Design a protein with these regions (language model features):
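Basic, ligand-binding patches in group-transfer machinery
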Residues: 1-149
């Protein structure tokens, strides 16, 4: 489902410590995170917090490098980016019992040379603006960043 009249968000990835980013965060299926496209041009999907007001959360796209075997937990890095809300009419139609889900979409442009080459698992982190509750969940999707020439 194409995001309705939304522009592709310019990527602004930041490298962070996985341990610090997910400190006090709970992996929870109440954060429904889905990626529909993770191709060479864009990452597109949606995320919805079930049972809470979605307007109260800041959301971040999180990329987990797959090649972290042998690294200590404290040394593991992830790539994060604040995602801007994109209108998704079908979320509102299909989840009428959930609050403020229409802006649950995201569509981020892929640009080469912003990430190190490798395979990445894609997840979403949601932070409540008032209580600072942190929820995260994987999307079950992966993407590959090719070597830069």
């Amino acid at each position: 489902y194409l995001t309705d009249r939304n522009l592709l968000q310019e990527p602004a990835w930041q490298c962070e410590s996985r341990q610090e980013l997910l400190e006090n965060a709970r992996q929870d299926d109440c954060l429904m995170a889905r990626v529909e496209t993770a191709g060479p041009e864009r990452i597109q999907g949606y995320s919805v917090i079930l049972g809470d007001d979605n307007a109260c959360y800041d959301k971040f796209l999180v990329l987990f490098p797959e090649d972290t075997q042998g690294q200590r937990e404290a040394d593991r890095k992830v790539w994060t980016m604040n995602i801007l809300p994109a209108y998704r009419q079908e979320l509102e139609e299909n989840l009428p019992d959930q609050k403020n889900v229409a802006l649950g979409g995201f569509c981020v442009k892929r640009k080469t040379e912003q990430l190190p080459p490798g395979n990445y698992g894609i997840a979403v982190l949601a932070v409540h603006r008032i209580s600072k509750l942190k929820l995260w969940n994987t999307t079950g999707k992966y993407m590959t960043e090719e070597k830069h020439v």
